[in-house]
Structures are given as structure tokens and as C-alpha cells.
């Protein structure tokens, strides 16, 4: 037992169990002041944001009474997001449409960019580019934004009375209700991250093992599941906001 204890202590001292150092793949960092910034995520996120803003500006810069193809597409997307928000939040959905829409569009375009844009062709000093949602930092940030949003929604409508939900229907459930607020962002972030990472890894492995034509059906399936993941994230975010405003589980 003494030998085993000493061995474990030695391993820990050598840093072999530093969980914070565990990474999926190699990463490229920028050192800005005293902060280490994950450059890959910033670069790809800026590209996705530029695609969204550029597409919106080009499509609706000159609105027509009879919509053009681009304007018609964006109006369809807006109606879809409004329907999702209204279904999950209720009649007070209006102020939350921009937030839900931003989540859905950013995640959707991020997911598709991983399959459609040739990120791998861009050489970096270290690591390689990939979809923003292929990185846990992005998905955790989106999940935390959702948590802040539903706390704000509940507090803005009910004030401090919002916290009474933690002891309903009985105070015995207080620990479980508190734990639920931690599991929501965890489930949102890891579900999205895991699905997108797994999809890209499957495609990479298939391309390396078999001719390029064979993985194409898997790539199309990946595009479909990427869209579904964006819809799931946005729908759950809207549902959590609606739940916090209504005060029921």
C-alpha cells in the first residue's frame, strides 16, 4: 500500500493527471496580454459571423413588396424561428426571437461550415481549423449564454419570487432543483460538442480508409444531423426560457 501510494503521488506531482491539460487535437493560441486566446475558434467564428451578416445584408438591402429569392428565404427563416419561439415560450415570445434566432443561425452555419468549408487547407503554425462548434469552448459559451438568458427571463418577470420555484412543490426537492440548473448547460454543451466532433471524426476516418466516393453518404447524413443539432439547441433554449417565465417543470 505504501509503494502504491508513493507511486500515485509521484504521478500526480509529475502532472500526468492534470485534467485541465487534456485537449482534443492540437490548438493554436494567441497571447494577448496575460490571456491565452484560442485563435482557431476566434478565426472560424469570425468567418461564420461574416457569412451570416454578409448574406443578410445582400438578401435584404433593398426590400421589395414582392420578395426576391434571397428576401423570401430570410423571411421563411424568420417565420420558422418565430414559430419555434412561440411554441416553446408562449405569447411573450417576441423579445426572445432575436436571441433564439441568433443561436440557431450561428450553430447551424457553424455546423455546416465544418462539412462544407475547406478548413484543412489553411495552414496554421500549430493545429488546424475546424467548425467553431467542434470546440468545447464554443458550446460551453453558448450554453452559459442560454443559462443567463433564462435566469434573466425569470427574474425580469417575477423578481426575487423566481427563486421560490426551487422549493416547489416541496422543499425536499431543493437540492435536485438547484442541480438541474447545472445540468442544463452541461447537457446542452456536451450534446452539441459530442455530435459535431463525432461527425467530423467519422468522415476523416472514412476518407483515410476508403475512396472519397464512399464517405459521401455519411457526409450528407452529417449535414442533416448538424441541422437537427442546431434546431435541438435552439428549441431547448426557448423551452428553458419559457419554463423560467411560467415557473413550472
Curated annotation (Swiss-Prot):
UniProt superkingdom: Eukaryota
UniProt membrane topology term: Multi-pass membrane protein
Localization terms from the record: Plastid, Chloroplast thylakoid membrane
Keywords, comma-separated and alphabetical: ATP synthesis, CF(0), Chloroplast, Hydrogen ion transport, Ion transport, Membrane, Plastid, Thylakoid, Transmembrane, Transmembrane helix, Transport
Entry's transmembrane regions: 40-60, 97-117, 136-156, 201-221, 222-242
Cystine bridges: none
Chief site of localization: plastid
Keyword RNA-binding listed: no
Listed GO MF terms: proton-transporting ATP synthase activity, rotational mechanism
Coiled coil: none
GO cellular component: chloroplast thylakoid membrane; plasma membrane; proton-transporting ATP synthase complex
Entries under CDD domains matching the protein: ATP-synt_Fo_a_6
Quaternary structure annotation from Swiss-Prot or TrEMBL: F-type ATPases have 2 components, CF(1) - the catalytic core - and CF(0) - the membrane proton channel. CF(1) has five subunits: alpha(3), beta(3), gamma(1), delta(1), epsilon(1). CF(0) has four main subunits: a, b, b' and c.
Family: Belongs to the ATPase A chain family.
Cited function: Key component of the proton channel; it plays a direct role in the translocation of protons across the membrane.
NCBIfam families: ATP_synt_6_or_A
Protein known as: ATP synthase subunit a, chloroplastic
Amino acid at each position: 500500500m505504501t509503494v502504491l501510494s508513493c507511486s500515485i503521488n509521484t504521478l500526480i506531482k509529475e502532472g500526468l493527471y492534470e485534467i485541465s491539460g487534456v485537449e482534443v487535437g492540437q490548438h493554436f493560441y494567441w497571447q494577448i496580454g496575460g490571456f491565452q486566446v484560442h485563435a482557431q475558434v476566434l478565426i472560424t467564428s469570425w468567418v461564420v459571423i461574416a457569412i451570416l451578416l454578409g448574406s443578410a445584408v445582400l438578401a435584404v438591402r433593398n426590400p421589395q413588396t414582392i420578395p426576391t429569392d434571397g428576401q423570401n428565404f430570410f423571411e421563411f427563416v424568420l417565420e420558422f424561428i418565430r414559430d419555434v419561439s412561440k411554441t416553446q415560450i408562449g405569447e411573450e415570445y417576441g423579445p426572445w426571437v432575436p436571441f433564439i434566432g441568433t443561436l440557431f443561425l450561428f450553430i447551424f452555419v457553424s455546423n455546416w461550415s465544418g462539412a462544407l468549408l475547406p478548413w484543412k487547407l489553411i495552414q496554421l503554425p500549430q493545429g488546424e481549423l475546424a467548425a467553431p462548434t467542434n470546440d468545447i469552448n464554443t458550446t460551453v459559451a453558448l450554453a452559459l449564454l442560454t443559462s443567463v438568458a433564462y435566469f434573466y427571463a425569470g427574474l425580469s418577470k417575477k423578481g426575487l419570487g423566481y427563486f421560490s420555484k426551487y422549493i416547489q412543490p416541496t422543499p425536499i426537492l431543493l437540492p435536485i432543483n438547484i442541480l438541474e440548473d447545472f445540468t442544463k448547460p452541461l447537457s446542452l454543451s456536451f450534446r452539441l460538442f459530442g455530435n459535431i466532433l463525432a461527425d467530423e471524426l467519422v468522415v476523416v476516418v472514412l476518407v483515410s480508409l476508403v475512396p472519397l466516393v464512399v464517405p459521401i453518404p455519411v457526409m450528407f447524413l452529417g449535414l442533416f444531423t448538424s441541422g437537427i443539432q442546431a434546431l435541438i439547441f435552439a428549441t431547448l433554449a426557448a423551452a428553458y426560457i419559457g419554463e423560467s417565465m411560467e415557473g413550472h417543470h
